[in-house]
A protein has these predicted regions:
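Short, glycine-biased loop/turn motifs at secondary-structure junctions and
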Residues: 1-166
Length: 166
């Protein structure tokens, strides 16, 4: 099963600690300071399969959203709300909608932070923090903190803190 790293960077690829991510699809990225210690630093950080702490992402309109493939032989360390890896391959460069859409196209659809999710009649839609979930009639829509959940007639909509449910 392919694993994915979702992260945001500045328009020039700059990230925390002055590390600059390549903005070319197919670029191999290696952590110059790799450490398998279970603490921040010493790796390439992001949200594994788009799930984790949405507060770690840059929500500004000019942020670049990256999705990187985590190869099977990459070292991965689980941190609280994020992970770090020793290397990965850039698979997508874009904005919030295109990056979360890329993950959805890869079959990663459950709880992706920032995702815009739509489900049809009697469908189920779930979005992570800052996400949007929409479901058709008799469907269920659930959104995380700061999210929006909308369901059609007879449906159920649930939103987290500061969210809106209709």
């Amino acid at each position: 099963m392919t694993r994915w790293l979702l992260k945001t960077v500045a328009a020039d690829g700059a990230a925390y600690g002055d590390f600059v991510w390549p903005l070319e699809v197919g670029a191999e990225v290696t952590a110059p300071d790799w450490s398998d210690a279970p603490k921040c630093g010493g790796g390439l950080h992001g949200l594994l399969d788009g799930r984790g702490d949405g507060a770690l992402l840059d929500w500004s309109p000019d942020a670049v959203w990256l999705v990187a493939e985590v190869p099977a032989d990459a070292h991965l360390v689980d941190l609280d709300g994020k992970v770090k890896v020793d290397w990965c391959v850039v698979a997508h460069v874009g904005d919030q909608v295109s990056a979360t859409g890329f993950l959805a196209d890869q079959g990663v659809v459950d709880g992706v932070v920032g995702a815009h999710v739509v489900a049809g009649h009697r469908g189920v839609a779930t979005a992570g923090n800052h996400g949007t979930a929409t479901a058709g009639n008799h469907g269920t829509a659930t959104a995380g903190n700061h999210g929006t959940a909308t369901a059609g007639n007879g449906g159920t909509a649930t939103a987290g803190d500061y969210g809106t449910a209709t």
